[in-house]
């Protein structure tokens, strides 16, 4: 079975200058998969592209990969604040 999270990481990592800071959160419900992508702030423009063209291309490729696996996928590109809202807080103080 295709691991959509890994496919997205393989697409995004060569585009960004800090691939070690690529974070992908996967939420699946049946055949629906939501991938939340976060990159370093300085790489955000590289992932979105002029007029959103790179983001649209990434989503198109991911939809093709999902279709091959009989899944539906949505890719959300999060900024730092949105990532912190979706990530559970740790209990450390």
Where are these regions (language model features)?
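RNA-contacting regions in translation and RNA-metabolism proteins
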Residues: 1-44, 56-93
